[in-house]
Amino acid sequence: MAAVFDLDLETEEGSEGEGEPELSPADACPLAELRAAGLEPVGHYEEVELTETSVNVGPERIGPHCFELLRVLGKGGYGKVFQVRKVQGTNLGKIYAMKVLRKAKIVRNAKDTAHTRAERNILESVKHPFIVELAYAFQTGGKLYLILECLSGGELFTHLEREGIFLEDTACFYLAEITLALGHLHSQGIIYRDLKPENIMLSSQGHIKLTDFGLCKESIHEGAVTHTFCGTIEYMAPEILVRSGHNRAVDWWSLGALMYDMLTGSPPFTAENRKKTMDKIIRGKLALPPYLTPDARDLVKKFLKRNPSQRIGGGPGDAADVQRHPFFRHMNWDDLLAWRVDPPFRPCLQSEEDVSQFDTRFTRQTPVDSPDDTALSESANQAFLGFTYVAPSVLDSIKEGFSFQPKLRSPRRLNSSPRAPVSPLKFSPFEGFRPSPSLPEPTELPLPPLLPPPPPSTTAPLPIRPPSGTKKSKRGRGRPGR
């Protein structure tokens, strides 16, 4: 993993290969002089005219001028996310998502700077069909730019909000793709730590992509732990809350909370404020609705084990243990990885520029990248050395061997009211929480009696949480930097 944005990219001056022998005078002798001496070079050769276009050919010069702003996709405290079209250089006309971060806001805190570095490095190094791809990265005097593949299917949150709850086969598909993505991150020593519906995007074909790697932790392999308090409360594992040290098992707790959310309409532990929500996560009872199948019930309970060593996926097997659970018995994992399994929902898009799956609060705004007039100190700019990056080949490096023409299957919809959005409580990694001394260490608690079954007239499972007629603002939605 590159450190502090360090990348081995060729510059316009070229790069010298290490260990290559220097040319002798004879080797460097021009071809014309060899022929004048009556000598012909041995083997194949090619005469190359030295011009500005044939010498010092390096990575494409990339900058804001290469992109036309089309729409605003998101906005947050650190900057904006735009839909853009490339108007210069290679991939002319291609649509991307451009994340713009303000340096001045990031460098105020060392941990924000470190998390920005981590996100940049992870996006550059991790290639997987279910992880968003970085195409370019560059910077100006006051801003950082990440050019990502544009995922026009929108957030999984939007679709979950629209449906209310998912049927188990629908949830199984999304959970399986997320499992493969998490397993790949873990194999690289990376903990994701912010799994939630808002950070899961859908491609135009309907497959998931994990996004927003600002809270990831690198270099956490088997046996290592970290203690940073970060994430979104409703999906955070109890060992993060009590600060007992955590490892990659926290991602499996979050996946269990997400699974519960998909199947019931809300995360497993919620309350009217942060403190009570935390208390419930640490020592609350888990209530499972009766309409869940035995396999779904069993997997949720194994994901939400409070002891990380007893949690499914928490052992050396990691994702492989999750994949072997009976809930996924009908899943062909090789076909899933190759995009040969039909998604349960395929976004209805009119064109590459279609933003109908995004929040209209943002897409209706006029896209403007404000002037870059911030002057940072030399020491502040040192934090972003080596940020620039151009992908060796856009898309091809992660798509070899995969089929990208899945068959269209009509989505199965529920006749339930729209789900009232959860308000994720996004904490900065340095914001502390000290649990009450009365709270015990996390232990597995028995389940309460089953909830009463849905009314006989119901044609589909009902969410546990009653739908609300008013929408709550979704804190953290569209936050490009964190």
From Swiss-Prot:
Active site per UniProt: D194
Species: Homo sapiens (Human)
Motif (Nuclear localization signal): 471-477
Primary gene name: RPS6KB2
GO cellular component: cytoplasm; nucleoplasm
Biased composition range(s): Acidic residues: 7-21
One term of GO molecular function: ribosomal protein S6 kinase activity
Keywords, ordered alphabetically: ATP-binding, Cytoplasm, Kinase, Nucleotide-binding, Nucleus, Phosphoprotein, Serine/threonine-protein kinase, Transferase
PANTHER family reported in the protein's UniProt record: RIBOSOMAL PROTEIN S6 KINASE
Disordered, as annotated region: 1-26, 407-482
AGC-kinase C-terminal domain segment(s): 329-399
Keyword Membrane: no
Protein name in the entry: Ribosomal protein S6 kinase beta-2
All residue ranges annotated as the Protein kinase domain in the record: 67-328
CDD domains according to UniProt: STKc_p70S6K (cd05584)
